[in-house]
Structure formats: C-alpha cells, structure tokens
Amino acid sequence: MAKVEQVLSLEPQHELKFRGPFTDVVTTNLKLGNPTDRNVCFKVKTTAPRRYCVRPNSGIIDAGASINVSVMLQPFDYDPNEKSKHKFMVQSMFAPTDTSDMEAVWKEAKPEDLMDSKLRCVFELPAENDKPHDVEINKIIPTTASKTETPTVSKALSSSLDDTEVKKVMEECKRLQSEVQRLREENKQFKEEDGLRMRKTAQSNSPAPASAMAGKEEGLSTRLLALVVLFFIVGVIIGKIAL
C-alpha cells in the first residue's frame, strides 16, 4: 500500500545545517507548518539520539499553525574529512479526537496513517570563522615581536656596556705597559749602577753594598712578577668580555 504523502511543510526541506565551530552546542531550527484544516501530531526522530537534543521532539500542530523545533548538536571533535551520516525523520499523522494520552496514540497508530519526511545533517565551518582566527594571529604576532625586541635591546645595552669595559681595560693595559717599560728602564739603570758598585766593592772588599744591590734587584723582580700576574688577569677579563 502506498505511503501517505507528508502534509506538514518543512523548512528546510532536506538538510539540517550545523555551523561550527563545534566546541560548544550548535543549534539549528526546523520549522513545521500545518496547512491543513485538521490538527496534526508530529514526532522528531534521529539516528544519533545521544548527539542531539530536540525541543520539542513531539506535539500537536493546530490547523493552519506552525511550530519551530530547535535541534541542538552537542560539542564534539570535528573532522572535516569525515562525512556526517546522521539523519532526522519527522513523523506525523492526523490527530485523533482523543489526544489525552499521546504515547498510546502513537502506539495504536496504523502504518498507513503515518507520514514521514527525512532530512540529513550537514556540518559546516563558515568562512567567518577564519576571521577571528586571523585576528588571533595578528594579536599573537605583535606580542611575539615585542617579546623578541626586548632581548635585542638588552643585547644592545649589554654590548655598549661591554665596549665601555673593554675601553677601560685597554686604557689600563696601556698604563701598565708604560709602567713596565719604565720599570725595565729603571732596572737597566740599576744594573748598570750595580755593575759599577760591584766593581768598586770588589776593589774595597765591602759586603754591605752587595746586600743593598740584591735588595733592590729583589724588589724590582717582585714588582715585575706582580705586573705579569696582573697582565694575565686583565687578559682573562678581556677574553670573557669578548665572548
């Protein structure tokens, strides 16, 4: 026996479109209209009842009236490569005289009295979703840029400070070099004087001047050694600053 044609008008007729993002509940509306002169009972069914919440999912539409049904898709991990196989069916029949127990009405309904329409579900990610994403990227990029500028400024300041320290150390090195040169000249002069004194001492056989000369040489050697150590320390400091 041929199925009775659906008397209700559906908007949309064939597809229920859900626009993402799907990280929160997404709601779409289905409008059911009753263009007849009789009241019509309806019921909305789905192949994935755990994924959707339908309000109202059943009821009676008066003659010439219409009703909006909210279909709420629950949050889920959306995969654009996965096609939705979810479907909805709007089942209807003309309301009997007694509608006090709708559960019994549906149970006692004859198959030939039932009318149904099927709709498939479509998931979409609209182009508008890309705009907030671009805004977020624009927000992130300046933030990242500002963060990268800070180390650059720090490096510049550090570099200028290092240059100042190097200049000071170089000036100190020049001063120490001059001091070493002066001490070398003094040492040379002392040696010449000591040579003369030693010759005189040898002639006079006096040990006292020899002790004095040894003390002077020891003092000069100690000062030279201290300068060499200082040069070594300065060299290490320059090496660290250069790195």
Curated annotation (Swiss-Prot):
The record marks 43 as: Involved in binding the phosphorylated serine of the phospho-FFAT motif. One of its GO terms (molecular function) is protein-membrane adaptor activity. It is found in: Endoplasmic reticulum membrane. Residues 2-218 are cytoplasmic. Disulfide bonds: none annotated. It is a single-pass type IV membrane protein. Homodimer, and heterodimer with VAPA. Interacts with VAMP1 and VAMP2. Interacts (via MSP domain) with ZFYVE27. Interacts with RMDN3. Interacts with KIF5A in a ZFYVE27-dependent manner. Interacts (via MSP domain) with STARD3 (via phospho-FFAT motif). Interacts with STARD3NL (via FFAT motif). Interacts with CERT1. Interacts with PLEKHA3 and SACM1L to form a ternary complex. Interacts with VPS13A (via FFAT motif). Belongs to the VAMP-associated protein (VAP) (TC 9.B.17) family. This is Vesicle-associated membrane protein-associated protein B. It comes from Bos taurus (Bovine). The lineage of its organism: Eukaryota, Metazoa, Chordata, Craniata, Vertebrata.
